[in-house]
Amino acid sequence: MSYDRSTAEAVIQLYLDGLYECDADKLGQAFHPSADLRWHEKGELNVLSYADWLERVRQRTSPKSQGHPRHDFVVTVDRSDETTAFVKVKCALPPRFFTDYLVLMKLNSGWQVVSKSYRYETHD
């Protein structure tokens, strides 16, 4: 299936929908294949490849299927030019609530996430 990647906003929505639905196909369209995910835990930097992350997504039960309400929204979009955007979003995979920092670039095939760094808190 082909998804809209004509704008950074469309890719952000695709990303948020993919997370809420645990839809690896949507997330795969939002991310560039060379992207990775980075987070800090116990004083250490952790790095996960895009392919390994999608495999984890495929194993999850989605918040949507569990009847959880959506907790996702865009906090900021900062564009340095017509081809690069830095986006901060809030989202949830209960009981974890995330702040994601996404770098998007407009490539020949459209906008894609090329890097993701995040932090999360656990709530009961």
Feature-to-residue mapping (PLM):
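Surface-exposed, charged secondary-structure patches
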Residues: 4-10, 36-97
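Short, low-complexity N-terminal intrinsically disordered segments enriched in polar/charged residues
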Residues: 1-33, 48-51
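A contiguous, well-structured "functional interface" segment within a domain
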Residues: 1-7, 64, 115-122
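Short secondary-structure capping/turn micro-motifs that flank functional sites
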Residues: 35-36, 122
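Short beta-strand segments enriched in hydrophobic/aromatic residues
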Residues: 31, 91, 117-118
